[in-house]
């Protein structure tokens, strides 16, 4: 079966009354990732990047451009990556997840870039990939890292609409 991914994204709605739902979805994913890592020192960091420009009255206007969510959870190992790359994945269904929340990211933001440092087969690895409505998941790369690198995942929501 062929699929028009942009059409699939367009089927989802982001109510105007809940504009922070994509951020909430990303934070829930981070919380679950920390739970899956079974660590007691879980950490989530949220960074808001703003565009700064002067308006006509010499006052700074700052619109949100990007939001970055960083956590030290389990990361995008093969199992989690394959779940992310599968629309309506049942991987986390026991946690009440439907496998479609990331579509909200693309309703509110132009694209998403992900960098995840995780452990697989007793080796530290870094997986990077892009996610957007035109190409779905693309440009995925994995490389091995030295063991002293900290395990972190950075989800960057780019270009607030």
Where are these regions (language model features)?
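Acidic ATP/Mg2+-coordinating residue in the GHKL
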Residues: 71
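A short glycine-centered beta->alpha linker in the GHKL/HATPase_c
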Residues: 75-77
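Short amphipathic beta-strand and strand-loop transition segments with alternating hydrophobic
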Residues: 47-58, 137-147
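GHKL-type ATPase core
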Residues: 92-161
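Bergerat-fold GHKL ATPase/HATPase_c domain
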Residues: 1-54, 60-62, 79-85
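Beta-strand secondary-structure signal
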Residues: 45-47, 66-68, 113, 154-156
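Short beta-strand element(s) in the Bergerat
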Residues: 56, 61-67, 153
